[in-house]
Amino acid sequence: AGARIILLESSESRLHDLQQDFVRANVADSATFYLGNVADRSLLDEIFSLHRPRILFHEAADKHVPINEEQPLAAIDNNVLATETLIASASTCNTRVVFLSTDKAVAPASLMGATKRVAEQIVLNHGGVVLRLGNVLSSHGSVVEVLARQIAAGLPLTVTDPGARRYFLTIAEAVGLLIAAAADSRGPGLFVPQLSALYFISDLARFMARTLAPNHNVAIEFSRLRAGDKESEQLWSTSEMPHAANGNSLILIDSPSIARSQFQAQLATLRNAVESRDLAAALAALRVLVPDYTPSEAVLARSSSAQVSNG
């Protein structure tokens, strides 16, 4: 039998779009689609038992920084605890895990970045592969999608800060790097791509305005960095050690880790806090797991408010 791809999607409309994409590409017969959530252990066990996949690409996450700052318990639940559930299920049939992470996990200033850093540790603790990327252009909800909508509506383009810079990759580049990371003989481990430079978001906005509205004078409005935002990101921290890239342009990163038993105990503390809806305890547990996480004033205020309400 030929290779098959198993797709799990939590959104019915997104799953429908995926199915139609496979039909249009004439490859629908090589795919099996599931509507469900990566936190559903019984569904995951059913999928792994039935299909026994060799490789799992885990990309499900809450990824919008402002929403994660506003909904911290939901973000921890989906980005950390659901990842733990997924990895536990995958380990029952020795599936190789490749996890898509973000440069926001490095010395995180956002709750999203901190949750992705813990998810990285979960995957690495189970012998998986982590690929830490920058911003993927034209992905769902990306800055390109937002700017394109604003241009189409004749609105000014909104950029958070004149100095805001990011690493950018195309979807094709990101997919190629995921496959390369899965096949890299140096794995399991943490990989980052060899990216040449950070780009100003304002330059991207100007390029899109020239390209999509060449006959219009499109204004750019600068607001300010949002809660959890940084002016620029980095691909590894000062406590991590990069190795020279190999032929596939991936850099292997040595990342500090703690004893597995200690890590599992800290995860259990985090899970208990989330399940009891105790934001202050969840934030404290998250900061133990990610010591270089600097919570925003918005998250700290929300935590303090929750403590007063519970008190």
Task: Identify the residue ranges that each predicted region occupies.
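Conserved Rossmann-fold NAD(P)-dependent oxidoreductase catalytic core, especially the SDR/UDP-sugar
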Residues: 52, 58, 62-117, 125
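Residue-level signal for the nucleotide or nucleotide-sugar donor/cofactor binding architecture
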Residues: 10, 39, 70, 78, ...
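N-terminal Rossmann/SDR dinucleotide-binding element
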Residues: 1-52
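Strand-loop microenvironment adjacent to phosphate/nucleotide-handling motifs in alpha/beta enzyme folds
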Residues: 120-311
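Conserved beta-strand scaffold in the Rossmann-like NAD(H)/NADP(H)-binding core
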Residues: 33, 99, 130-132
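Short secondary-structure boundary/capping segments
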Residues: 22, 50, 72-74, 113-118, ...
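Conserved residues in the N-terminal Rossmann fold of short-chain dehydrogenase/reductase
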Residues: 34-35, 77, 222
